[in-house]
């Protein structure tokens, strides 16, 4: 089985995350996608509670699976109660799924600090890594920095051209903006019903 792993804060998940997952299903020839709501040691703590982020990740998986079972959510990271390193997650999933054919999917915002990750060289050695970019007018995509880090063949870069950011969405939600066009409908409904990010 070829497994793709997509970890993130998902605070909240948005249409860019959905597009990345659908791209993985249609074009990367992977059999299964595992979505993991994480606590990134290199970022500020998530605003939403772990249980809410896991639930929103589950709603993201349900949205993906409407057109065929493909995605599932691992709550292993969130249940640990502290930040977990990507190498630990990958090794855990290798054991659970009895496969070493894992592909790590990451957004370019995380990729820019990839060399700060624990055991980053081991990640390159053991796994395929695909970096998804989001071109943006606000400078969120730094082509020179991306190119510098993509000089070897350890990474594949795919530009989705979807300039969506959970950080910006949280700011807009806190201001009372309607972000329903940027967030999958079931997740938007969950945010509204649970009064998240107000």
From Swiss-Prot:
Signal peptide start and end residues: none
Reaction it catalyzes: nicotinate beta-D-ribonucleotide + ATP + H(+) = deamido-NAD(+) + diphosphate
EC number: 2.7.7.18
CDD domains: NMNAT
Keywords: ATP-binding, NAD, Nucleotide-binding, Nucleotidyltransferase, Pyridine nucleotide biosynthesis, Transferase
Gene3D superfamilies: HUPs
Keyword ATP-binding (UniProt): yes
UniProt-listed Pfam families: CTP_transf_like
A single BP term in Gene Ontology: NAD biosynthetic process
UniProt GO molecular function: ATP binding; nicotinate-nucleotide adenylyltransferase activity
UniProt pathway annotation: Cofactor biosynthesis; NAD(+) biosynthesis; deamido-NAD(+) from nicotinate D-ribonucleotide: step 1/1
Domain of life from the UniProt record: Bacteria
The family this protein is said to belong to: Belongs to the NadD family.
General function of this protein: Catalyzes the reversible adenylation of nicotinate mononucleotide (NaMN) to nicotinic acid adenine dinucleotide (NaAD).
Official protein name in the record: Probable nicotinate-nucleotide adenylyltransferase
Organismal lineage: Bacteria, Pseudomonadati, Chlorobiota, Chlorobiia, Chlorobiales
């Amino acid at each position: 089985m070829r497994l793709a792993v997509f970890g993130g804060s998902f605070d909240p998940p948005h249409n860019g995350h959905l597009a990345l997952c659908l791209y993985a299903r249609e074009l990367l020839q992977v059999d299964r996608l595992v979505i993991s709501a994480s606590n990134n040691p290199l970022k500020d703590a998530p605003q939403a509670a772990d249980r809410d982020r896991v639930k929103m990740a589950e709603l993201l998986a349900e949205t993906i699976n409407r057109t065929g079972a493909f995605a599932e959510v691992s709550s292993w990271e969130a249940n640990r109660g502290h930040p977990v390193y990507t190498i630990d997650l990958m090794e855990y999933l290798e054991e659970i799924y009895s496969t070493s054919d894992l592909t790590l999917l990451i957004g370019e915002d995380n990729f820019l600090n990839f060399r700060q990750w624990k055991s980053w060289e081991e990640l390159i050695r053991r796994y395929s890594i695909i970096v998804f970019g989001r071109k943006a007018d606000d400078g969120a995509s730094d082509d020179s920095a991306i190119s510098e880090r993509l000089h070897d063949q350890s990474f594949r870069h795919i530009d989705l051209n979807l300039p969506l950011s959970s950080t910006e969405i949280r700011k807009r939600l806190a201001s009372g903006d309607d972000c329903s066009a940027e967030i999958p409908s079931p997740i938007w409904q969950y945010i509204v019903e649970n009064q998240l990010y107000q």
